Amino acid sequence: FTVNIGLIEHGVPVLGVIYAPPQNLLYYGAKKLGAWREKEKGKPEAIHARIPAADGLVVVRSRSHPSKIAEAFLNTLTIKENIPSSSSMKLCLLAEGTADI
């Protein structure tokens, strides 16, 4: 599970925070500050999405809510690895460059 906090100013998102207590991982990003990850007792690390590898995509999938539509779409792609994940962690894995889609 995760705790998610966002700040919107005048209809524009300016800050986002995702904390995963079981892993003690904190992800955050802010306008003009970039995106960051902090592991337990670690210093902040800048994170960024990646360019997919030519040999296939790394896919994060819902652990508890499979979708026939998503499966049909994914079947059209070359997939190198599947990572089951839950809640907002899927978005964090994309943001840190662990997964492609």
Regions from the PLM with identified roles:
Residues 1:
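N-terminal glycine/serine-rich phosphate-binding loop of ATP-dependent small-molecule kinases
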Residues 4-92:
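Acidic beta-strand-loop-alpha-helix segment within the catalytic core
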